């Protein structure tokens, strides 16, 4: 039996976004996803359970499952708030999937963290960001902080979470 796709049922290649389920509506990643949708991009959001940006076993398991189910070569937007729970999964899939991080701030620099907690978070963020094909940031300060973690300058792209930023992100994804 052959199933034929009718022209009206054809869909464009979908983007995938992995982000915390409880991410506020005004968060950079969520606003960028909405800007992409408004620009006509097909989007599937994979929401991770648990608190963020804390490391959470349920979010780690959900991240492992979500990434394993994605098709080879899929463009995947990773919200920076989810990087702690994705860090263990990323090395297994960084050659198979096209990861782009949406980072509004680095969490390792949170002043409420102890020195040990900050060091752990810095290592997790640095390792995760090193596996990204590109890192999208909303401002120059965040771009400088990401570059300070060793991410190559040509991989860090400043883009507002609006129509212009969505167009810039779509151009980045098309070039990957």
What positions do the PLM features span?
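C-terminal alpha-helical cap of glycosyltransferases
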Residues: 164-176
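Short beta-strand->alpha-helix junction loop in the catalytic core
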Residues: 52, 158-167
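Active-site proximal beta-strand in glycosyltransferases
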Residues: 75-77, 92-111
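Short N-terminal targeting/anchoring amphipathic segment
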Residues: 63-87, 98-100
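N-terminal subdomain of nucleotide-sugar transferases
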Residues: 1-50
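Helix-loop-beta element that forms the nucleotide-linked donor phosphate-binding surface
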Residues: 143-162
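Membrane-proximal helix-turn-helix segments that form the acceptor-binding/catalytic region
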Residues: 116-135
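Alpha-helix capping/helix-boundary segments
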Residues: 82-83, 141-143
């Amino acid at each position: 039996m052959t199933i034929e796709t009718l022209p009206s049922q054809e869909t464009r290649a979908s983007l995938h976004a992995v982000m915390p389920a409880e991410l506020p509506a005004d968060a950079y990643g969520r606003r960028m996803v909405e800007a992409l949708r408004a620009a006509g991009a097909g989007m599937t959001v994979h929401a991770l359970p648990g608190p963020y940006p804390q490391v959470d076993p349920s979010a780690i398991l959900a991240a492992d499952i979500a990434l394993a189910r994605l098709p080879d070569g899929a463009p995947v937007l990773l919200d920076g708030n989810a990087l702690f729970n994705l860090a263990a999964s990323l090395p297994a899939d960084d050659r198979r999937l096209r990861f782009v991080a949406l980072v509004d701030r680095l969490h390792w620099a949170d002043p409420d963290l102890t020195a040990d907690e900050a060091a752990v978070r810095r290592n997790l963020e640095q390792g995760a960001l090193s596996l990204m094909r590109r890192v999208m940031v909303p401002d120059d300060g965040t771009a400088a902080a990401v570059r300070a973690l060793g991410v190559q300058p040509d991989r860090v792209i400043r883009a507002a979470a609006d129509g212009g930023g969505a167009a810039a992100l779509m151009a980045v994804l098309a070039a990957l």
